[in-house]
């Protein structure tokens, strides 16, 4: 059975954010703490990217207004011995979703890993 790399996108809300950098740091730290507490320290966490609709330049998926930030995180994990891409997706969503309760998740990419 093949192995897959599954990338999920999460929308993380940060309250009392002082800046964009602060919101990114807090989001990564809080997500990492929750994943580590669930013994899922093998999940890679990073800030996602978005492209400007006007110029096409990439920028970090972070938005801060009135001290509240929303950060788009990318969560990547390898799923071993999955029966199909759909099976790998279900495994990743269940594991990460359980650790990051009440955080919206969306599948961004599923590729066969080596």
UniProtKB/Swiss-Prot annotation:
UniProt feature coiled coil, ranges: none
Pfam families the record matches: DUF555
InterPro entries: UPF0212
Signal peptide: none
HAMAP family the UniProt entry points to: UPF0212
Family label: Belongs to the UPF0212 family.
Protein name according to UniProt: UPF0212 protein UNCMA_00570
Species: Methanocella arvoryzae (strain DSM 22066 / NBRC 105507 / MRE50)
Taxonomic classification: Archaea, Methanobacteriati, Methanobacteriota, Stenosarchaea group, Methanomicrobia
């Amino acid at each position: 059975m093949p192995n897959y790399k599954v990338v999920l996108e999460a929308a993380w809300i940060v309250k009392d954010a002082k800046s964009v950098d602060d919101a990114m740091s807090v989001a990564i730290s809080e997500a990492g703490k929750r994943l580590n507490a669930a013994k899922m320290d093998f999940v890679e966490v990073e800030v996602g990217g978005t492209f400007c609709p006007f110029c096409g330049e990439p920028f970090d998926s972070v938005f801060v207004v009135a001290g509240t930030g929303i950060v788009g995180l990318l969560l990547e994990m390898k799923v071993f011995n999955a029966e199909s891409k759909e099976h790998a997706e279900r495994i990743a969503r269940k594991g990460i979703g359980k650790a990051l309760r009440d955080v919206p998740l969306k599948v961004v990419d599923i590729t066969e890993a080596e």
